[in-house]
Amino acid sequence: MSQFLTEDFLLDTEFARRLYHDYAKDQPIFDYHCHLPPEQIAENYRFKNMYDIWLKGDHYKWRAMRTNGVAERLCTGDASDREKFDAWAATVPHTIGNPLYHWTHLELRRPFGITGKLLSPATSEEIWQRGNELLAQDPFSARGIMQQMNVKMVGTTDDPIDDLRHHKAIAADGSFNIKVLPSWRPDKAFNIEAAGFNDYMQRLEAAADTSISRFADLCVALNKRMDHFAAHGCKVSDHALDVVVYGEADETTLDAILARRLAGNQPSTEEIAQFKTAVLLFLSGEYHRREWVQQYHIGALRNNNSRMFNLVGPDIGFDSINDQPLAQPLSRLLDAQGLRNALPKTILYCLNPRDNEVIGTMVGNFQGEGEAGKMQFGSGWWFNDQKDGMQRQMTQLAQLGLLSRFVGMLTDSRSFLSYTRHEYFRRILCQMIGRWVADGEAPADIALLGAMVKNICFDNAQQYFAIEL
C-alpha cells in the first residue's frame, strides 16, 4: 500500500521516478494562459488570509461545496472569510476521488510547506492560523509566490479595450524578472448575439477612437487595439468558441448584419454564423501577420442555472460541457484561414472529451510550413484538468500526433496557488511514460525520454510562443 502524497506521488515505476526527479521536477513554469488579475501582480498584492488566496473566486471549490450541501452564503455570499474557510474544510474530506483533494494538499505543501496534515474540521484552525502567518511574510505576496514556484512567464487574459496599465507597470519594474504579458481575448466583439454587444461597441469605439457603423470599421478598431496590445508584448490570442460555426458572407451582407444589430435587432442563426466567421477570419489574418498564437477553447455550456445567474452572476460554477457538433465547421474555418495563407500557430482545446479524437486528427490536417507542432491539441481543459483527463488527452495526442512536440500544461486559473497543477501534470506525464517503458512500449532510454519530458514541461512552450525571457 502506498502512502498518500509522498515525494513519489503518482510515480509508480522506477523509470517514472527518474524522469520526474531528474528531468521534470525542477523545470521552470511557462504559464502561457491564465486568468490572474494583473493588478495584483503590479501592486504585489498581500493576501488578507487563507480565504482570500485560496477560496475567493474559485468556482471549482464552490461546485464541490454546493454538492456537499453548503449554503450559498458560505460560497459566494455574505458569510465571514473564516466561516467560508471552515465550510471548505468540512467539504474537503468528501472530495476524495476528485482532483480537488489532490490539488488542496499539493497547494498546502507548496508553497506553504504544510505536510502530514489533511484539511478537515479537525485541522482547519491550525491550517488557518499557520497559513495566515505565512501570508504576512514577503515570500507569500503575489510576486513572492510566483518566484517561489519558479515561474518565468504568465499570459493573462485581457479584453481589447483594456488600457494594459498594469502590464506596463510590471514591465517597467526592474526588480521583478517574471514576464507578465497580455493575451488578446476579443469575445465581446465577436458575440454579436450577446445582450451587451451594442454597449461594448460603444466602449470599443472610445478605446480605439474609431466610429463603428460598418464591418470594416470594426476591423479598423480591432486592429488599433491589437497594435496597443503588441506594444505591450502580446503574442497570444484566445477565443471562447462555445459553439463552432461557419458561414460565408460578402462585405455588404456583413455591413447589413452589423447595422441591424446596432439598431437593436437580434441577428438570425445564419447571421450570427456569418458575422462570427468573418471576425475570426479577419483576426486570424492579423495573428498570422503579427506572428501571434491563436487559441480556441471549444465547447462550454455556460450559465445553465438562470436563477443563480440572476442572483450572483456569471463564472461562479454553473457551467458544464456542451455537445454540439464541431468537426465540419471547425474544418471549414481552419481551411478558410489556410486558403488565405493566414493560418497562424493554433492551439485547440475541447471541453467535451468525446471530441478528443476530432481535435487530435484535425490538427494533423493543417500542420506544415516547416514548423514543428504548428497546430496543437491543447492540454486537458477545465473539467478535463484532472488525472484521467490529462492521461486521455496525452494518450490520444501521442497516438494521433507527436507528444514530443506538445507545449504542455497551463493553469487557466485565477489563483496564485494553482502552479502546483504544473507539478500534477508533470507527475502524470512521467507516470504515463514510465508505464510505457515498464510495458516494453518505449525504450528504457533515459536521455531520450528525459529530453522529451523536459521539452514538454518548458522548452517546447518557450520556443513555440517565441517569448524571450
Swiss-Prot record:
Catalytic activity as recorded in UniProt: D-glucuronate = D-fructuronate; aldehydo-D-galacturonate = keto-D-tagaturonate
Gene Ontology biological-process entries: D-galacturonate catabolic process; D-glucuronate catabolic process
Which pathway does UniProt place it in? Carbohydrate metabolism; pentose and glucuronate interconversion
Sorted alphabetically, the keyword list is:
Isomerase
Q: Which SUPFAM superfamilies match?
A: Metallo-dependent hydrolases
Top-level taxon in the UniProt lineage: Bacteria
Q: Name one GO molecular function term.
A: glucuronate isomerase activity
Q: Which HAMAP family match?
A: UxaC
The protein's name in its UniProt record: Uronate isomerase
